[in-house]
Amino acid sequence: METETKSGIGFFQKYLTVWVALCMAAGVLIGKFLPGIPQFLNRFEYAKVSIPMAILIWLMIYPMMIKVDFQSIKDVGKNPKGLFVTWITNWVIKPFTMYGIAALFFFVIFKAWIAPELATEYLAGAVLLGAAPCTAMVFVWSTLTHGNPAYTVVQVATNDLIILVAFVPIVKLLLGVSNIAVPWDTLILSVALFVVVPLTAGMLTRTFVIRKKGVEYLENTFIGKFNGVTTVGLLLTLVLVFAFQGETILKNPLHIVLIAVPLILQTFLIFLIAYLAARALKLPFDIAAPAGMIGASNFFELAVAVAIALFGTSSAAALATTVGVLTEVPVMLVLVKIANSTKHWFPESTQN
């Protein structure tokens, strides 16, 4: 079982940025000195989807979906204001602010360092991040801010279902504005492979295990068997992505920093929008904090998967999504501290 620190965040999760940096280095070295490995793996693809990458991405996403109790949606009518904050922030505001901020930096502020064709792909990667609100990691951020666990489950479950219908048209719309060709069939196939399949598998697994062993066994024993699987899948995926990106990164190491700047600014902006909206609505802190965290963080596993399917493992779009992984944990931990230090802004907790 994955070791947890006293802060409530798992050891691997707490130091995820370190592991990501190490995987980046390992991937770049493989791409530079063992180029035959990524070239060999690149042979195995179907409908523009890399089979090895698909397997690793399923390893990332399936364990997350087992944790989500979709039965919780029956409680959607309880304190709906918190859900409205989450939904509006995630689907009406966030994708478009991400597009605007990324376009401003990649095409205007950083135009002296980023060629137009690279800027276009970096923008595509940013859009994919902005259109996919976080799922599993929200439970970590909710725990660290003493969020209402039952309400957090409802927030996550409803967003997972909205992804099924909103992700494709939003991505298509925003990338279309930038004249980025995105085939509908590949985009829909990506969502089917990397959301519908693991989501369905997770729901079926929950149902089967609960019927056979009960909810207590599922929550306390079965889910624990998958601790670390998502992290391992993510890290191996990053090794492969950076193996394909090795030459590009060695030529343009500054680009990692340039990509990170708008992604970090977007994270703080979206958190503040959701968090201050929750304050204006006088929501309790244990609902307000997770609402801010869901919008601020990204479903980066999905973003990486779709970027690879649409643009290829060695694309600049895939690189941009992986930079999102690199910045996620340290930035979110800062937001956790901000939330906990402003807890007094909000009414008393909804929990007993």
Segments (PLM) and residue ranges:
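Alpha-helical transmembrane segments of multi-pass small-molecule/ion transporters
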Residues: 1-66, 71-296, 300-352
